[in-house]
Amino acid sequence: MSKIQKKDTEPWVAKYRPKTVDDVSYQEDVISALKKSLNTGNLPHLLFYGPPGTGKTSTILAIAMDIYGPELMKQRVLELNASDERGIEVVRTKIKNFAGYAVNKTTTGTSNPGATFKLIILDEADSMTTDAQAALRRTIETTSKTTRFCLLCNYISRIIDPLASRCAKFRFKPLDTVATIERLKFISQQEGIKCEESVYQAIQVVSNGDMRKAITYLQSAFRFFANKISEDVIYNIAGSLPPQLIKQLVDCCKKNSFDRLQSMVQSIIAQGYPVSQVISQLFDYVLTTKDLNQSQKSHITMKIGNVDRNLIDGSEEFLQLFDLSSYIMKQLNNNSTSTNGDDMLIG
């Protein structure tokens, strides 16, 4: 493959990943604290947690680049995806072997020429088994003179306390609308993409604070549609329902007709939209609408939980979506708030 072809097919997530700590944006508190550690040359074990696509991996790779430079990165950084290599054997062999040997001080060309430690990055560490985490805790204790560990996870509650307590914890918050759109516009400018403001808004909505998703959606849309990107294109790529379709479903519920509602639900199913996604967007509607009072919202939310559980258990999708839609219709057209969320539960 030629260099031009490689450049054209390179994922933009990798292409526009921050190369240094100064390039990392939107996580100012985290970066400020980490810079102080880098300046003192005393990097602790780290635990980064937060939603996907908020910059956890990009930040630690940028830190590693600042410490070691591009050449030593290959020798002194071990990056593992703990969801694939999650068992105790990986800790006992690969991690322990890499962490065990000492290294010389880093030389010129790095921001921290006195660093005498290696770095092990464990992505998706919350997928590791409890036994593997316990073994890792012991490895961290015995190799702290030669190795620093950085654990990345979405759910800090899944990391055992003895392991979490040995790390400096940093929370990565979801990116807000302004930050996401600003970054998308920068990438669009670099790639020569022309989009309406509404397209960026649509990407922000479907990515829900996940910058990795947002950039991937933008690249996919540009690949297939060039500069003819519309809101509908973004919703199709993301597998989300266009807002107007959710509105049509809600309007159908307001008309209080089971026949019309059944036809509407059948139409949505026939168009191939994931029912889990439909339910998620209905949940967003319930939270934000002014057509329902707080009691009605709480009843519908309980119903959504029941339907979601039934879908996970393998219940028929049409029946579950029709059941939920019927319940929303009942609440929208009923002033009584005494309805129980299990009235129409279909297993």
UniProtKB/Swiss-Prot annotation:
Subcellular location: Nucleus
GO molecular function: ATP binding; ATP hydrolysis activity; DNA binding; DNA clamp loader activity
Keywords annotated in UniProt: ATP-binding, DNA replication, Nucleotide-binding, Nucleus
Listed GO biological process terms: DNA repair; DNA-templated DNA replication; leading strand elongation
Gene3D superfamilies membership: 1.10.8.60, 1.20.272.10, P-loop containing nucleotide triphosphate hydrolases
Superkingdom of origin: Eukaryota
SUPFAM superfamilies cross-referenced by the UniProt entry: P-loop containing nucleoside triphosphate hydrolases, post-AAA+ oligomerization domain-like
Record's GO cellular component terms: DNA replication factor C complex; Elg1 RFC-like complex; nucleus
Residues that bind ATP: G50, P51, P52, G53, T54, G55, K56, T57
Record-linked InterPro entries: AAA+_ATPase (IPR003593), ATPase_AAA_core (IPR003959), DNA_pol3_clamp-load_cplx_C (IPR008921), DNA_Rep/Repair_Clamp_Loader (IPR050238), P-loop_NTPase (IPR027417), Rep_factorC_C (IPR013748), RFC_lid (IPR047854)
PANTHER family per UniProt: REPLICATION FACTOR C / DNA POLYMERASE III GAMMA-TAU SUBUNIT, REPLICATION FACTOR C SUBUNIT 4
General function of this protein: The elongation of primed DNA templates by DNA polymerase delta and epsilon requires the action of the accessory proteins PCNA and activator 1. This subunit may be involved in the elongation of the multiprimed DNA template.
UniProt record similarity statement: Belongs to the activator 1 small subunits family.
NCBIfam families on file: PRK00440.1 (NF001679)
Subunit composition and interactions: Heteropentamer of various rfc subunits that forms a complex (RFC) with PCNA in the presence of ATP.
The protein's name: Probable replication factor C subunit 4
Protein source organism: Dictyostelium discoideum
Name of the coding gene: rfc4
